[in-house]
Each structure stands twice: as structure tokens, then as C-alpha cells.
Amino acid sequence: MNRLLSLIIITASAFSHLNAQRVIYSEFDREDVRQTNFEIIGRYNSNVLVYKNLRNRNTISIYNADMKETQRVEIDYMPDRMTNVDFIAYPTYSWMIYQYQRKSVVYCVAAKIGPEGKKIGEPIQLDTTDISYSSSNKLYNFIYSEDKQQLMILKVNNKNEKKYMFKTLLFDKDLNMLKISRVILPMTDRNDILTEFSLDNEGHLIFGHGDRASNDQNILKFNLVQKQAQADTFSIKPINLDNITLDEVKIKADNSNGRYVLTSFYYKGKKNTIDGIFHSEWNKATDTEANNLAIPLNDDIRAEARGENNLRNAFNDYYLQQIVLRKDGGFVITAENLYTTNRGSANPFNRWNYFGSPYMNASDYYYYGGTGWGYPYNRWGNSVTRYNADNIVVMSFDKDGKLQWNNVIHKSQFDDDGEATISYTTVNTGDAVRFLYNDFEKRDPILALQSIASDGQIIRNPTLKNLGQGHTFLPRYARQTGQKQVIVPCQYRGFLTFAKIDF
């Protein structure tokens, strides 16, 4: 009797969990055509704020708990010629960092946005730059620490390919100035590259500097570069590469354990076949490399992950996507199989500038990264390129960098219009990490959900309720707005809408 009662309780709990998964859509507005640039700012109380830009019009839409648009706030203080907008959200307000060009001057300005989408106080000018040309690309990079207490804008003048001139401006969370620095980074060759920039909780800037033989080859030498919060110099720390070369390097500050974690796919020598995962740790206290591992990918995981490739080339189309740090010092990485197929004679594929590669080289004067907002359609400008996003590999490592488990989420996606509908997003609900992506098995893509538990087991969740109403999801641009809530942009009859998913 007790066992039967327990079974009933467990079953009821399971059905309750399934019923809790629901999707609520916003109504489409004819002003929100699919070319609209947007940024999901975050949730304030039960409202969700979304920034929108179309040509020279900038607004913030307020959606209530039922995803009804209750207000659209005009941002009339933003000028024309906008080149980039970034947001950082706090519990009671957010900062909007925007860039624009007027004549020959680029401005970087901050506006404080309240929960109702209206500005608090007057915009703050953070920096300006004189340039001699007209540009639609962003000039400044905006980064912030994990705890959001340290904020930085920075720009790089690489007109002199032997000496990159950095200007960094460090602020606290209220945008009080903490430090302005101008620092020169020596460069050895025009094929040198810089990785994405990161900021740790102490305000230290970190990034990577790689040396390549040519523009499309592997990294032969690699340095971790650090600028301490109050320093005016770079500290350059060589990373040991023992007869291997590297692919794209991801660097993350492990603030809980006082270290920097570096991860990359590696190749043996100068070959073009990915052999495994490279892992390095830099200890902040001792200022030394604390761990350095080259972890081969065995045949079992290659067989599971390979897709259309043979065993040896199983990972040649994979790109590292995320490093998720655990408090115990371990970490999880995800990698996705991304490639293009070309139906014409020209092939635009280049691994080093593909799918939003963060790298900057000497051809990018005053420029780093992309526009930073919206979503792309048909990047190559022709209809002969098909974008593909297939399997996701998830690997868990302990604090010493030893592989604990790995698993593969199988999917097959393609899009001829760009990258908007393919790839995935993750939602960390505490009990598991959920992967949301479009399933292309049927004629129209439908949103699928799979979860990975802490022991690496994959759980294929039932189809979410309230799907199939003509909405095409764009999961790669989603934003988690609560422990078990995510806002996902959608296309509906050629218009931009949004869906709220509660788990």
C-alpha cells in the first residue's frame, strides 16, 4: 500500500512538472519587422524589458506576465548613426552603453534605465574618439565582471601593426571612474591574433595573444595577457605548448578559485586534424601556470560525435562554445558542430573568421568583434550558402582537468537565410542544464528540449506545450530571466515576437 501511494505521489509530481512547462507568446506588432535589431534586457518584477532598434528609431517594450506589450517607451535621447548598444542588468535598474558617430567623432555614452524602461537622470559621456572616416562598426568593447561590480570599456588602435595601443576605462557598478590606462601591446607579426576580452572580479583585464604562421593556420605560440586593475602595463605570460598547436582559445576567470582557465581544441604539430582538448590553468596567487594538459579525444567519443565525418576527422567542424565553472574547481565545456555547405563555385569557409570568431588581427583598425546586437541573415550575401549546426558535445572535467564524463546531444539543423534559427541556448535550472534548439526533422522546425544532469545523463524532455502556432524560434538569441524562465525571440509571419517559457 505504501509503495502504491509513493508511486502515485511520484507520478503526480511528474505530471505537475510537465504541466509547469508552458509557452506564452507576445502578439506581433507590424512595426516589429524581422529586420528589427533587439536586445532582451531582463525581467523586473513580473515585466520583461526588450530594447528594439529599426533604422533611427529606438524603443524599449514592456511586456507583462502574460507577454502583453503594455508600453513602448521612445528613446528620443539617442542620436542617429548608432553603431552598437550593450546592456548590463541589475535588480532595480540597468545600464545601456551605446555608441554613435557624429561627424568625425565616435561617442560612448551610458544611460541608466529604470524598471519602466525610462531613463534615470541624464546620459553620461564615457569617452570619445576622433576618427577620419565613417564607420558602422563598433569602436569600443564593453565588458564586466562576473559579480557585475567592475565594468570596463576599452578600445584598440592597431594602425601600427607592431604596436597595438589600448585605452581602458575601469568603472564601479555606479559608473564611478576607477582607472584610465593607455597601454601598448607589442605584436610580432600581422598574423598575430587577440582573443575575447574578460574582466575578473578584481577588475583585472585578461585576454589571449596568439602567434600564427599565416592568417588561416593554427596558433603556434600563445600568451595569457593581464592588466591589473590599477596597473598601466601588460603582464605577458607564455603558455607552454609542447609540440601541439591550438585552435580558438577560450579564457575564463574562475573567481571562486583564484585562477584563469584556458581551453582549446589542439592539433599535433601543424596538422589540421583536431586531436583533443588543451587545458591550462594560471594561478593568480603564485602567478604561475598550475596545470597544463593535452587530453586526447578517444575513439568512443569520436564515434558518438562524428556526424558525417569519419572517425579521425570527427571534431574538425566543432567549435568550443562555453566554459561553465563549478565551485569545486571543476568545469564543463560545450562544443557544437558548425559548418557551411556551398552550392556554388565560391567557398567562403574559413575557420578563423567563421560563426562570429572573436579574433582580431592587424587588418581591423580600431575594430573588434561584431555589431553586438540583433541577429544576422545571410551573412555571405548570397543564396548558395547553407548554414549547418549539428551535434553538441558536452564534457565535464574535475578540478585537476581530468575528464569525468562526456555525452552528445544529437541534432541536425540547417538554414539558407543565415544563422538565426540554428544552434541552441542553455538554461541552468539548478537541477540540470537544459538545451533548447529547433528540431528540423519535420517540414517546419519545432522547439526541442533536452537536459543534462550533473552526472552527465541526458534526459529528452517531452515537447513543450503550446507549440506549432506558426512561430519559428530563434533560441540562440534567448535570455534566461529567472531560475526556470527564459525569453526566446521568434519569427511570426515575417515579424519579430517573443515567447516566455516557464519550466
Predicted regions and their residues:
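Repeated scaffold domains used in trafficking and secretory/extracellular systems
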Residues: 32-41, 79-89, 129-143, 189-197, ...
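Beta-propeller blade signature
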Residues: 108-116, 165-176, 219-232, 275-288, ...
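Bacterial Sec-dependent N-terminal signal peptides
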Residues: 1-25, 503
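Short beta-strand elements that form the blades of beta-propeller/WD-repeat-like
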Residues: 39-55, 87, 91-104, 141, ...
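Loop/turn-rich, solvent-exposed surfaces of beta-rich toroidal or solenoidal domains
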Residues: 265, 320-340, 372-393, 416-457
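Post-signal peptide N-terminal segment of secreted/secretory-pathway proteins
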Residues: 32-148, 152-159, 163-167, 191-193
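Structural motif
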Residues: 56-62, 103-111, 161-168, 214-225, ...
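Conserved blade-ending motifs and adjacent loop-strand segments that build the rim/top face
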Residues: 238-250, 291-319, 406-424, 455-483
